[in-house]
UniProtKB/Swiss-Prot annotation:
Pfam families: Bac_DNA_binding. The lineage of its organism: Bacteria, Pseudomonadati, Pseudomonadota, Alphaproteobacteria, Hyphomicrobiales. Keywords: DNA recombination, DNA-binding, Transcription, Transcription regulation, Translation regulation. The keyword Kinase does not apply. One of its GO terms (molecular function) is structural constituent of chromatin. GO terms for cellular component: cytosol. This is Integration host factor subunit alpha. NCBIfam families: PRK00285.1 (NF001401). Belongs to the bacterial histone-like protein family. GO terms for biological process: DNA recombination; positive regulation of metabolic process; regulation of DNA-templated transcription; regulation of translation.
Amino acid sequence: MTSKTVTRADLASVVCKKVGLSHTESAALVELVLDEICNSLVRGEAVKLSSFATFQVRSKNERIGRNPKTGVEAPIPPRRVVTFKAANILKQRILDSHRAKQKKDLL
């Protein structure tokens, strides 16, 4: 498993190389897309990126949790969380890549 983390700058570099925009324009485009995704989620809208994933805001009820160090119970207040559900196409690409790597390692 790789430990590489893709950053905004990495995404901007890819856009710069593949689309032909300047690095500044590419960074602005990446920022614009990410801002729109965030704004949609803040408004409570689901964001579906076909063949990639769906991001959705979900409400979680209040519940009782436990401090792992002390074992003391404490209420966890209700909150809203973002969920990520990978599309089947993305899941399959990841699985295929994993299988190909395993096969290569066996040879």
